[in-house]
């Protein structure tokens, strides 16, 4: 898998535009909070390091990944310039994983298209909890 070849936190910070004039919305799922909270912290830190003012970061929390598109839509209807959608779905024994991943993915895509604002897709869809932990500040960095 490509992730095993690269630390997700390694990027050239000089290629990131100055965010001082941007307002960013973040929607984060509370399900798997021990993972999503780390992804959220990484996103906020990166935004601030890129010049986005803390007061220009709007945060909405939702129960699970399936609610991410609706909250992203709520944020898109405001004055934000872009949105980050953060969630984690871990494969279980039923097809629920497939339905949640598909619905969330399609919903976020629709918000991108309808509002002509970028919605960054930070939805971990891993086979195991450990894989998600590894991608939330663990051995693979922070997605």
Where in this protein do the model-derived segments appear?
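Glycine-rich phosphate/diphosphate-binding loop of Rossmann-like nucleotide-binding domains
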Residues: 14-62
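Glycine-rich oxoanion-binding loops at beta->alpha junctions
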Residues: 60-77, 124, 128-129
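Short, ordered loop/turn segments at secondary-structure junctions
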Residues: 30-31, 88-89, 124-128
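Glycine-rich phosphate-binding loop
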Residues: 67-108
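C-terminal binding/interaction regions
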Residues: 97-98, 102-143
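Structural motif
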Residues: 25, 58, 81-83, 117-123
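N-terminal amphipathic/basic leader segments beginning at the initiator methionine
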Residues: 1-20
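Generic secondary-structure signature for well-ordered alpha-helical cores
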Residues: 3, 33, 45-53, 73-81, ...
């Amino acid at each position: 898998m490509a992730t095993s070849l690269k630390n997700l936190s390694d990027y050239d910070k000089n290629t990131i535009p100055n965010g001082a004039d941007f307002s960013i919305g973040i929607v984060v799922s509370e399900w798997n909070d021990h993972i999503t909270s780390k992804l959220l912290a990484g996103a906020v830190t990166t935004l601030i390091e890129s010049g986005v003012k803390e007061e220009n970061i709007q945060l909405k929390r939702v129960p699970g990944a399936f609610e991410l598109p609706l909250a992203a839509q709520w944020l898109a209807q405001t004055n934000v310039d872009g949105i980050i959608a953060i969630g984690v779905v871990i494969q279980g024994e039923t097809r629920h994983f497939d339905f949640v991943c598909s619905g969330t993915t399609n919903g976020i895509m629709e918000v991108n298209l309808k509002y002509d604002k970028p919605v960054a897709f930070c939805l971990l869809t891993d086979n195991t909890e450990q894989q998600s932990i590894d991608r939330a500040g663990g051995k693979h960095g922070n997605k």
